[in-house]
Amino acid sequence: MDFLEIVGQVPLKGGVEISGAKNSALPILAATLLSQQEVKIKSLPQVVDIKAMALLLQNLGASLEWLDPNTLQICAKSLHHTEATYDLVRKMRASILVLGPLLARFKECLVSLPGGCAIGARPVDLHLKAMQQLGAEIKIEQGYIHAKAPKGLKGNDILFDKISVTGTENALMAASLAKGITRIINAAKEPEIAQLCAFLQSGGVEIEGVGSSELKIRGVESDALNLKDIQIIPDRIEAGTYLCVGAITNSQLKINRIIPNHLQAITDKLIEIGFSLDIQENSIEIYPAKQRQAFEITTKEYPGFPTDMQAQFMALATQCLGTSVIEETLFENRFMHASELQRLGASISLKTNVATISGSTELTGSDVMATDLRASSALILAALVAKGVSRVHRIYHLDRGYERLENKINALGAKVVRLKEK
């Protein structure tokens, strides 16, 4: 098992290029199961979750060829079975995304209940109800979802009681091959969903309301779905994380290959804290702040402040003047990084879903343990400003979602080394 050793308080400067968005790539990879045509997906990040999804597609019988480290050619014409086994699915929760495509195309599938980060319950009920609304029969037996629709899926209204990103994506993909018209009400509005819509539209699926909370989909036949090659959008959470690298170290950094509109909740908050930003068409440069002010954050669905950035901003809060407050409204049990930040010297108090962080704190290097993907990046941020050497353990969480993070940070001047546990 690997860990990162980080020397703190090293000056940083330069630029970093953002990788493709893991959270856009995963549903698009799953969507290739809908079609019998060959398609190329470009700008795939080389992270564990993408490799796991590619392996799952291959296990189902899809033909895969890596044309370069970030471009995958896929043809799902000759799938030989429709069972997503526990061994493959347990590694990440996003594997539930194969449920909609397999059910829609083959009228029956068996998908293991998924794994991934241990953040709250994250129930799959919303996915299952969506499939049932389209006419599927669902049973859960021995840890597997058995879904079938002998006469095929039929368009219908799907109302989500709670906004769900992956639930919306699964419903979108299933509706793409359903007969008639489907309306998804209270749909998630993330940019990653908009790109999935664009991918499905490229194959002939008619979708209205892209970017809104109500989507209207007119399905097509599988053999008529001709998906076009696509380039994955930049990862807004990775971009936000590197903006926080600049913010916590109070450095001048340029974040390249981004879509600034996707980052507005993050950049608005950084400006409120006291940073100057030069926002261009596909880059943002952050400049050192004369004084960093404490802040308040409440996580919300897009376009609100992303839950995937609250851990990084908690680390940043330790260096701001005054007391900051972060309220997590989307997931339970998502403050596990707080106790590890405390090991570095952070002053944080927790009350249910609210964290209060005292600022202007001198952090000291220590051994800390990553508990999930975004927590791992928060610990690295804190280690960059801590006095002395820190070691971040269990970075397999980090490798699920960040491409070559230590290489990118080291290119800015940091001293980060990946080592093996003894």
Curated annotation (Swiss-Prot):
Identify the Gene3D superfamilies for this entry: Enolpyruvate transferase domain
Q: Could you say which residues bind phosphoenolpyruvate here? A: K22, N23
Q: Catalytic center at which residues?
A: C117
Query: Does the keyword field hold Cytoplasm?
Result: yes
Q: Which biological process terms from the Gene Ontology are attached to this UniProt entry?
A: cell division; cell wall organization; peptidoglycan biosynthetic process; regulation of cell shape; UDP-N-acetylgalactosamine biosynthetic process
Give the record's pathway: Cell wall biogenesis; peptidoglycan biosynthesis
Single annotated GO MF: UDP-N-acetylglucosamine 1-carboxyvinyltransferase activity
Subcellular localization is given as: Cytoplasm
- One of the record's GO cellular component terms: cytoplasm
Binding residues for UDP-N-acetyl-alpha-D-glucosamine, per the UniProt record?
R93, R122, P123, V124, D125, L126, D308, L330
Q: What class of enzyme is it?
A: transferase
The UniProt catalytic activity note for this protein reads: phosphoenolpyruvate + UDP-N-acetyl-alpha-D-glucosamine = UDP-N-acetyl-3-O-(1-carboxyvinyl)-alpha-D-glucosamine + phosphate
Q: Give the enzyme's EC designation.
A: 2.5.1.7
Q: What is its main location?
A: cytoplasm
| Role according to the record | Cell wall formation. Adds enolpyruvyl to UDP-N-acetylglucosamine.
The identity of this protein, by name, is: UDP-N-acetylglucosamine 1-carboxyvinyltransferase
Which species expresses this protein natively? Helicobacter pylori (strain G27)
